Amino acid sequence: GSGKWRDAYYTNQDAYLDGSGNLFLRARVKDGKFMTSYLQTYSWQAPRSQWTTFGPGRGKYIEARIDVTRMQARGPWAAFWLFDPSDTYDGNPSNGTEIDIMEYIVDGGWMLNRYNVANHWGSSESRIIDAAAHGKNLRRHWHTFGLEWTSSRLSYYIDGKQVWSTTRGVSTSNEQALMLTIEYDQGPGDAWGINQNVFNDAAKLPDGMLVDYVRVYERK
């Protein structure tokens, strides 16, 4: 996607292959603006026949292998998620929800080795996952972030290990799109209350998120 959302400006030039087969979502400051990339498998500028969306079917497992160690500037957050662009927040999960498989925000404090998982449908459920409690260090190496999705349950994983599960507000929509994004909101009132000013860390930019793959498996 392109344009402005919250306090970030999005360009197609800030998503590219790094020369080693990985996708890099870059974050940078240019002309006093925070610029990055927002990738989605739908577009209101394209016919729906060109969208890539899906539902739980007989059961899905969605996984991405991601490296967030290059995220250095405080304030922006990297995310891997599902989103139904039609009626996500109308309170009816059958019309789709926002399913956050991984949201990671750089912070010098307690959030540095934690990430967020969530499901939003008008109401919300979310959990802050302490990676260390599962033997993981987000500031080192690659990690896989996964979601097992059935019509009645969402189960969240890191490196194949379940970290949370919920049966509330589960989407049964067939129009959930895949999203890979870096977002920024200076606040107040967003960015989970951390409200860091990315321009105070401009010397650490450009930074970004590396993605090895995104895979969607369906139970037969």
Regions found by a protein language model. Give the residues of each.
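GH16 jelly-roll
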Residues: G1-K220
